[in-house]
């Protein structure tokens, strides 16, 4: 997820920001983003009025309100080794930062819309911010059950926000929500089939969680449709290519490098990464004008070559390091240029 302000580490006991010794303080150093808020305030809802009103009512209904029981215990169900405990807690910290940063971005967009007199759009993004805050709250409670307090309100004091054009923000937000949906739902399905791997009750909330992520992606898709120029012609193809490629590349590197978390749940990280990418690429046909063509299998096959090259570069030194970097860059650029397929995504205007 993205947001509009900068970062700070977590609070263990109050006053001083720090994580327990077995966790890396860099877990709480995400990037935050700002965008063209004045341009966003000019979003033309007239071309999408019927769909917007239907989506507004769905978000207003807050179907998952009762599913997130604030009184539910989030104490771990199983004792974990010190190593597995650190793996689980690291996942919680990364996730709470991601959800809270999403809340910050949606809240800022909401405030800017309302300030510009676009009350409907402002309330629309308030609903999205509500969901992200709820998710962050549950993750924060799960961390407290581990004896860790994350000072969320102070996650925004050190790093200056990075500016992205509105089109970049919408493309990346759509993918962030949809890839999140597939991650949560696939983990949920796996744990339903393998209940002995459920080490904490937090995972019981992944089904309503993924429903929120899916709806958020649909909301962002609606916003993209209100800006037809973002998805037309060469610009639309280039934006589709760049964001699908960059999000999938990042997912492969992070999932496979953090395979210990998936191992804790009994999930093969390589197969999980592949399924998430395939499903997200397919889902993106509903929003993007172009998606990657996976029919020949080349995109997916290159993932392991890229991962190996990345690890070689990271582990190399001296004169070997630039050579390893060159090979890594060559591979990812070849993957970037692989064939795409035109979609039949609904467009307005």
From Swiss-Prot:
It catalyses: Mg-protoporphyrin IX 13-monomethyl ester + 3 NADPH + 3 O2 + 2 H(+) = 3,8-divinyl protochlorophyllide a + 3 NADP(+) + 5 H2O. The keyword Oxidoreductase applies. Its cofactor is Fe cation. Keywords: Chlorophyll biosynthesis, Iron, Metal-binding, NADP, Oxidoreductase, Photosynthesis. Residues 1-10 have a biased composition (Low complexity). GO terms for molecular function: iron ion binding; magnesium-protoporphyrin IX monomethyl ester (oxidative) cyclase activity. GO terms for biological process: light-independent chlorophyll biosynthetic process; photosynthesis. InterPro entries: AcsF, Ferritin-like_SF, Rr_diiron-bd_dom. Its EC number is 1.14.13.81. The keyword Metal-binding applies. Pathway: Porphyrin-containing compound metabolism; chlorophyll biosynthesis (light-independent). Disulfide bonds: none annotated. Pfam families: Rubrerythrin. Residues 1-23 are annotated as: Disordered. Transmembrane segments: none annotated. Belongs to the AcsF family. NCBIfam families: AcsF (TIGR02029), PRK13654.1 (NF010172). Catalyzes the formation of the isocyclic ring in chlorophyll biosynthesis. Mediates the cyclase reaction, which results in the formation of divinylprotochlorophyllide (Pchlide) characteristic of all chlorophylls from magnesium-protoporphyrin IX 13-monomethyl ester (MgPMME). This is Magnesium-protoporphyrin IX monomethyl ester [oxidative] cyclase. The gene is acsF.
């Amino acid at each position: 997820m993205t947001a509009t302000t900068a970062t700070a580490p977590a609070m263990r006991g109050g006053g001083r920001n720090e994580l327990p010794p077995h966790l890396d303080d860099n877990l709480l150093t995400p990037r935050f983003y700002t965008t063209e808020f004045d341009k966003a305030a000019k979003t033309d809802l007239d071309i999408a009025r019927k769909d917007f009103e239907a989506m507004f009512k769905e978000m207003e209904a807050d179907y998952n309100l009762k599913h997130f029981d604030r009184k539910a215990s989030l104490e771990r169900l199983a004792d974990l080794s010190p190593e597995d405990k650190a793996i689980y807690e690291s996942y919680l910290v990364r996730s709470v930062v991601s959800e809270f940063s999403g809340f910050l971005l949606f809240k800022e967009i909401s405030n800017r819309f309302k300030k510009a007199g676009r009350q409907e759009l402002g309330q629309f993004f308030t609903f999205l911010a509500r969901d992200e805050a709820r998710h962050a709250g549950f993750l924060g409670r799960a961390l407290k059950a581990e004896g860790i307090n994350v000072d969320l309100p102070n996650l925004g004091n050190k790093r200056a926000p990075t500016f992205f054009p509105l089109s970049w923000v919408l493309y990346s937000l759509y993918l962030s929500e949809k890839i999140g949906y597939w991650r949560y739902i696939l983990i949920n399905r796996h744990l339903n089939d393998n209940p002995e791997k459920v080490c904490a009750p937090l995972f019981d909330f992944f089904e309503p969680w993924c429903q929120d992520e899916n709806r958020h992606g649909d909301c962002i898709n609606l916003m993209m449709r209100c800006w037809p120029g973002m998805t037309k012609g060469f610009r639309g193809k280039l934006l589709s290519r760049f964001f699908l490629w960059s999000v999938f590349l990042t997912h492969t590197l992070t999932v496979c490098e953090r395979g210990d978390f998936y191992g804790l749940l009994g999930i093969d990280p390589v197969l999980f990464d592949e399924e998430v990418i395939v499903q997200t690429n397919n889902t993106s046909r509903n929003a993007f004008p172009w998606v990657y063509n996976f029919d020949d299998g080349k995109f997916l096959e290159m993932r392991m070559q890229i991962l190996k090259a990345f690890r070689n570069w990271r582990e190399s030194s001296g004169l070997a390091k630039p050579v390893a970097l060159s090979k890594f860059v060559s591979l990812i650029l070849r993957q970037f240029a692989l064939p795409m397929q035109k979609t039949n995504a609904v467009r307005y205007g």
